[in-house]
Design a protein with these regions (language model features):
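Acidic, metal-coordinating catalytic segment for phosphate/diphosphate chemistry
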Residues: 1-32
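Generic C-terminal helix-cap and adjacent flexible tail
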Residues: 20-22, 149-154
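Unchanged
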Residues: 56-146, 154
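Short small-residue beta-strand/loop micro-motif enriched in glycine and branched aliphatics
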Residues: 50-54
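Conserved beta-strand and immediately adjacent loop positions that scaffold enzyme active sites
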Residues: 13, 39, 122
Length: 154
């Protein structure tokens, strides 16, 4: 008997960033050092007790770009502008499903206010150098790090 193919899950998310509010000037040393001038939005998921980049599953007939923008707004209250597409990450879920997540850089257009819910109870802006101690997934760090390859506005 042929084995059934694992369920495919399509998801998308955003690396929502802003310049640090510390008043530090934006680096002139190139894209890699530019990450040091940025803060990134992380969401806390009480179900898993972890911090991660905002993302979620696509709805039927929804493009990955639409999914990324919708999920970021639902999870953070932030309306964003889609920037460069970053990495695509694939992994198996604990249930053995194949999940593919497409990521985009995003800049905030408007803050509609964060409202805690069952899925996400907090958001936190974190500096690049602090991410490794907070992010639950190494793939989130890889996605953020991928911003450094873009020399133009992301």
């Amino acid at each position: 008997m042929a084995e059934s193919k694992p369920r495919q899950i399509r998801a998308a998310g955003g690396v929502v960033w802003r310049l640090r509010s510390s008043g530090q000037p934006q680096s002139e040393l190139g894209p890699q050092s530019r990450l040091a001038d940025m803060e990134f939005a992380l969401v806390h998921r009480p179900r898993y007790q972890d911090w991660s980049l905002p993302k979620g599953k696509a709805k039927k007939r929804e493009s990955s770009e639409q999914t990324a923008l919708r999920e970021v707004r639902e999870e953070t209250g932030l309306e964003c502008k889609l920037g460069e597409e970053l990495l695509t990450v694939q992994y198996l879920t604990p249930k053995g499903e194949e999940k593919t997540v497409r990521w985009w850089a995003m800049r905030v257009l408007k803050d509609h206010g964060f409202e805690p819910n069952e899925e996400v109870d907090r958001i936190f802006w974190v500096a690049f150098e602090e991410l490794s101690g907070i992010c639950a997934f190494s793939s989130d760090l890889e996605v953020v790090h991928s911003l450094s390859i873009y020399e133009r506005d992301i």
